[in-house]
Amino acid sequence: MEKPYAIGIDIGGTNSVFGVVDKRGHIINQGSIKTGTYKEINEYVAHLSEGVQEIIDQVGGSGNIKGIGVGAPNGNYFTGCIEFAPNLPWKGVIPLAQMLTDRLNIPVALTNDANAAAIGEMTYGAARGMKDFIVITLGTGVGSGIVVNGQLVYGHDGFAGELGHTTAIREGRQCGCGKKGCLETYSSATGVARTAREYLETRKDPSLLRELNPQEITSKDVYDAAVKGDKLAKEIFEYTGQILGESFADFVAFSSPEAIILFGGLIKAGKLIFDPVRKHMEENMLPIYRNKIKLLMSELKESDAAVLGASALGWEVKDY
């Protein structure tokens, strides 16, 4: 009998979300755990497996599940391992696909979280019908899933498309990956918070943000201040969008995509981030690309796109 469901798991730096998905792309049920709560990988896998088993039981047990797909930072599709992910609590090489298979007795496939989001957009979202596009995930870090001629670009080792760790500012901010000046230290949600702290420390402008503990400021705090008209908060988003737009202008030159689709928590800022990104992308692109590349917001709920994309892997799971 054909198995009617697949599982999608999205592992982020803050939350891990998982869901049961049917063949039409409907998420039947889902759950989540806090990623950062678990400093030890075996404890994390145990709790994640318990949560996944609960939603499997709700649809009649593992006999109804075709496979499990996982999207994770630095996830390697070829090996099923998470390798040296700077925004996760566990370091080194983690054979996550095998660990989950051992606990759940269901085959597991794993890929980069941005690749999973790209699959979700191509199958169910803003990239339907497109063959050449890039999905940019803006969350704890910056990820990118590149699709060329309808195929995800993995590279020879599974790690193609690490836009977040290309250099935005020479000798700039220290990144968790060990490099300095990486794009994600400026243009992720955590990058926005870092910019806010720097501005508050080095400038004297009045700002609603000065009422907060600088070490606890989040990108949402900056957004809340900006929508109230706070000049400093608006400048923070302008700076963030400038760096991101300049990077996109370079990125476009490699694959000439039809569209760049923005996905993740930071896009909740809407025009505050979208407008400066578009402006600086267009200003810095080669003339042959100008006004040809669509800049789109994800059409899928933030939690849904990555879960749906990861679940697509579950339908075509391979053994490691």
Regions found by a protein language model. Give the residues of each.
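A short acidic/small-residue loop/turn micro-motif
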Residues: 35-37, 90, 160-162
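A charged helix-plus-loop insertion that forms the helical arch/lid used to bind
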Residues: 81-93
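Conserved PLP phosphate-binding loop immediately N-terminal to the Schiff-base lysine helix
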Residues: 111-125
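ATP-binding/phosphotransfer module of carbohydrate and carboxylate kinases, centering on a glycine-rich
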Residues: 1-67, 77-81, 98-106, 123-130, ...
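Short hydrophobic alpha-helix segments
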Residues: 31-33, 86, 156
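Short beta-strand segments
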Residues: 10, 69-73, 111, 135-141, ...
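Glycine-rich phosphate-binding loop of actin/hexokinase-like ATP-binding domains
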Residues: 128-187
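Active-site nucleophile and cofactor-binding loops and adjacent substrate-binding regions
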Residues: 87-90, 109-115, 135-138, 296-304
